[in-house]
């Protein structure tokens, strides 16, 4: 719920702690502006407590958005989220009957939920943190990417440095898109910013700072596509900001959005001993969790 609290702080900073708003607007901002959903009971309680401490009384529901419960969440103006990674418990598919492409991949299901939940007035937008596999998964993954680009203007993809959102080694991206008024023909070009290639290793001794995003923010141009200019060119092949047309994307194998072009350096870095130990611990935990999930799945099959 960090995005929710950060958004609330941003609004309050811009409105003199809401005092610049009318009474009606203040009530809306406090009681209706946000909506949250959490699956886990304990995390839900923490979210409610945190919201109370921030003066937010908007609803935070306990439930599974990938079940029929999530069908009612529609008409939103802005969605900011980093959905959980992995597969549905036991490997089953989502139980939403309104998903065109139900899959056991949580991220792909959440992506469908998100773009379906946006208002269709042509202004509703989303920024979603997703792992690399969403960009290149075949089968339903390709179909969902095509569906996203039809229903929404997927205008920007930010490749994040490795391991900053989740465990070390997990590669993530931020997808920025706006829902169209029609269900077809909304994406005409996609702008990519590569903040991963040829970057230093970030961690406790070298934290990622807001200043690392300065060039991206300038290139993003507040979402004004007409004001954007590539920093990449044939003369500057290591420019981090590059545009691809919709036709170029469709011509790629499996309509893959996993695009890199920078040649110098690599995604691999030199790590300190402490950072290597942290990675080993994290990967050991991930392996243990995967084994536990597999054992659970096998147990269900045996039953």
What annotation goes with each model-predicted range?
Residues 70-303:
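A conserved structural/catalytic subdomain of Rossmann-like adenosyl-cofactor enzymes
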